[in-house]
């Protein structure tokens, strides 16, 4: 059984991941962690995922040191300013489920990945990855003097723009195969 704490537990993605994890037999959600100052610290996660789960929301990553893996759904600023050094100290595997990192942030994360296993997944949608594979296929088939434009629209509460939904297609499609790939968010 995998023991994992979940950071960013009170957000949209965090709540969804947490609910799915809680309904699996092979995963034990060991902690629900929110950022310091979050008004839900001290509350129970049942407020977000249903009443059958009894786990308090805490705000201290270091309390969760006996976990097997961290899943972070916070945001780039919280990750880099508050959590990065704590993950480095904990030395545990890490899933980063947020976007909007700067180039400098990505370099720091790459450095951290030399010491601990890291998986970055800024988008958990199977549809996006199917879209990327389809895009790769068509990019190889089209004439090289054709421009491709991908326009991304989000709800008005989107906090991490540009999101991986817009970044991933251009990053995954080889630019050698593309004359121009323009992503607009």
Residue ranges of each PLM-predicted region?
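C-terminal substrate-binding/catalytic lobe of Rossmann-fold NAD(P)-dependent oxidoreductases
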Residues: 7, 12-64, 143-185
